[in-house]
Amino acid sequence: EKGIPYLVVYNKIDLLSTEKIKDLAMSVRAEEVLVSASDGMNIQELKEKIASLKPEDTHKYPLIQDLIEPLDLVILVVPIDKAAPKGRLILPQQQTIRDILERGALSLVVRDTELKSTLDHFLAQGVCPKLVVTDSQAFARVSKAVPENITLTSFSILFSRYKGELEIQLKGIAALSSIEDGDRILIAEGCTHHRQCGDIGTCKMPEWIRNYTRKKPVFEFTSGTEFPDDVSSYKMVVHCGGCMLNEREMKYRIACCQDQGVPITNYGILIAQVTGILRRSLGPFPEMQKLI
């Protein structure tokens, strides 16, 4: 039902007679293997079976490669604030750069403070970026700086599509318009970073939701592996992009919400909604614009 691959391993077959082992070997199914940890019997076969359990790449879409052509210019907007890690880019930014490189396109990484001058420089030379991808927190500022004829989206929205969740999470944002005082909202993050002043999950997200809805919902927060099995008491769930979670865990969390009839959306979609640029942020995906 869950589509989880498995093996049944029978150990200590060295304690059985040769004839008994032969009899068992004739009846084992494909997902069963007979081994002996003490003398190594069939251990290599076990390793090969474990390796064969690795699922094929289930991503329906690439991260960004299908949106660009070789030598296209893609500008990535990466704010450097108190929450940014020292000396490195975060995982979604790294993965996006790698995907652009594999396509043979050009990636240019700038801070939001240098974005306008960067765009002016290239446009003055007749070079128009194919796409601008921004950190969701800078959506409002970046949207004002990027001309309407240049496609704009966010890392969060790219990853939502990449993991096959964009349509579900777009539909989930509709719950924001029906929030009332006292409604419970779960804000969930996949990583366990040390929270700082102005943290997006515990500080900025609640403030954006209160300002947008003009209501006073009750916020609860989880991080890492704390995601509850029972989410039925929540009006909606707002999840991070899930870059630190594997695909199976993220799909499990979404399935929990769907099974219990609880709308789920993600940070990037919510930020785009409250800043009034959700439709524009879906520019690379016109089929998704029809859902809002």
Where are these regions (language model features)?
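Amphipathic, alpha-helical segments enriched in basic
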Residues: 68, 72-76, 184, 232
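C-terminal effector/interaction modules appended to NTPase cores
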Residues: 87-292
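Canonical P-loop GTPase G-domain recognition
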Residues: 2-66, 73-78, 82, 104-114, ...
